[in-house]
């Protein structure tokens, strides 16, 4: 049987995600971000709610990406997620993209010329942002041009890099309907961005979300809910360079900007430069909020939920892969658990995220 991997955030889960799961074959394993997202923001609803949405709509097994995999630039996000899925035995990776290309060929190219390609990136001027450097590399070696704003295409290339040299086939699915950042309501498939923006419009949600009741009942948060705490974390820290990935230049810019910024959005605007993109700045702010330090990634994989089919698969992995299904006295990943505690502060009605929680079980799909 085919074992298909899907890397996702489901922020929140919508019809486009359901379409992706419907297109996937065999046993479907989702490696999902926890409570903080790749582009450096808190999830609109918590990881358990999003895992349940996925399991109700075709996923067989949902596992959690640790905080320091979830909140990363595309390449590191892709690498960390593929590492986890590879250990869970996937033989194909399905993903949505704005531009369906021969990603398998791109992965083979990276297998062959990866060292040369990375050297090319290292030699590019530091005035370029990391995404600009990566795009220059793909243009040089694969003749790829980047048109407009296509974050899923960028992630797809990160997945191609991550599967290079592994026995995993890539299966791109053409993204349906609205673009990633689109807030347009007049489409067949709405984007997660639009759903977050129109979260109080019930008709809109019912049109585009399969598990709308779960979403409506869940406690929700936005970045601004954490601004007072973020401000405190910045002002009370005498040396921000002790925080993961914060260099001297960024530390100075953030300390200066917090004096006048009245919101997270304003802070991001003030700190962003040509070299430091908004997404990168948001990630740095997420690290500061969660007091992230350089950390070893957990060996064990945290299981958020499964169907009967998923449970059988986990059983077959016993002894080969270290799995955590209940976080108790023994921590799974201290960094992720700390981030979860901070996430809960954004809305006091958010349920406990780790202790006493057990995987969600869905009997039928």
UniProtKB/Swiss-Prot annotation:
One of its GO terms (biological process) is tRNA modification. Belongs to the TmcAL family. Transmembrane segments: none annotated. Catalyzes the formation of N(4)-acetylcytidine (ac(4)C) at the wobble position of elongator tRNA(Met), using acetate and ATP as substrates. First activates an acetate ion to form acetyladenylate (Ac-AMP) and then transfers the acetyl group to tRNA to form ac(4)C34. This is tRNA(Met) cytidine acetate ligase. InterPro entries: Rossmann-like_a/b/a_fold (IPR014729), tRNA(Met)_cyd_acetate_ligase (IPR008513). It holds the Pfam family HIGH_NTase1. NCBIfam families: PRK13670.1. It is found in: Cytoplasm. The keyword Ligase applies. The keyword Nucleotide-binding applies. It comes from Streptococcus pneumoniae (strain ATCC 700669 / Spain 23F-1). The gene is tmcAL.
């Amino acid at each position: 049987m085919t074992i298909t991997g899907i890397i996702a955030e489901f922020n929140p889960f919508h019809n486009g995600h359901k379409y992706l799961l419907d297109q996937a074959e065999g046993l479907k394993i989702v490696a999902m971000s926890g409570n903080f997202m790749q582009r450096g923001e808190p999830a609109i609803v918590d990881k358990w709610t999003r895992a349940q949405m996925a399991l109700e709509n075709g996923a067989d097994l949902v596992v959690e990406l640790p905080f320091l995999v979830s909140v990363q630039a595309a390449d590191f996000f892709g690498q960390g997620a593929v590492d986890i899925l590879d250990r869970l035995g996937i033989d194909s990776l399905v993903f949505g993209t704005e531009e369906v290309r021969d990603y398998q060929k791109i992965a083979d190219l990276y297998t062959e010329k990866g060292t040369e390609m990375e050297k090319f990136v290292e030699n590019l001027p530091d005035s370029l942002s990391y995404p600009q450097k990566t795009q220059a590399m793909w243009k040089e070696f694969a003749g790829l041009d980047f048109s407009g704003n296509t974050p899923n295409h960028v992630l797809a290339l990160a997945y191609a890099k991550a599967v290079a040299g592994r026995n995993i086939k890539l299966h791109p699915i053409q993204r349906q309907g609205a673009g990633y950042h689109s807030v347009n309501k007049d489409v067949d498939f709405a984007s997660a961005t639009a759903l977050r923006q129109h979260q109080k419009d019930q008709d809109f949600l019912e049109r585009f979300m399969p598990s709308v009741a779960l979403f409506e009942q869940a406690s929700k948060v936005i970045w601004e809910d954490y601004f007072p705490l973020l401000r405190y974390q910045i002002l009370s820290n005498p040396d921000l360079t002790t925080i993961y990935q914060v260099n001297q230049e960024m530390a100075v810019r953030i300390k200066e900007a917090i004096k006048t910024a009245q919101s997270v959005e304003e802070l991001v605007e003030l700190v962003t430069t040509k070299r430091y993109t908004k997404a990168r700045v948001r990630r740095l702010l997420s690290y500061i909020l969660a007091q992230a330090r350089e950390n070893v990634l957990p060996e064990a994989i945290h299981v958020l939920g499964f169907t009967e089919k998923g449970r059988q698969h986990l059983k077959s992995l016993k002894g080969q892969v270290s799995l955590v299904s209940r976080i108790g006295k023994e921590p799974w990943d201290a960094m992720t658990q700390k981030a979860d505690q901070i996430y809960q502060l954004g809305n006091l009605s958010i349920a406990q995220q780790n202790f006493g929680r057990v995987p969600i079980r869905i009997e039928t799909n």
